[in-house]
């Protein structure tokens, strides 16, 4: 159960990185997102069901056989989300080069892209 919770938490963190968690600064380098009203985090309504499938391969590097697992949910989530968006918009040749990708930024990229040949 602990490993499943770590995977869920890591995936939610990756989703937040890709879509929500923007840390902005003004022209004087002061943070613009200083509270959770401005710095958005994903909550249960924004999340898809997350399935976890675990395979047990104990470590031989320590006496308990334990390994870290939480990061394995975080690292691929943002890449998978951004790749999925780019794939959905492949006819427009949209390339996303920064995260998080906001709806407004995504609209800008689509509007600036070449229209698909019809």
What are these regions (language model features)?
Residues 1-118:
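C-terminal catalytic domains of large/alpha subunits in multi-subunit enzymes
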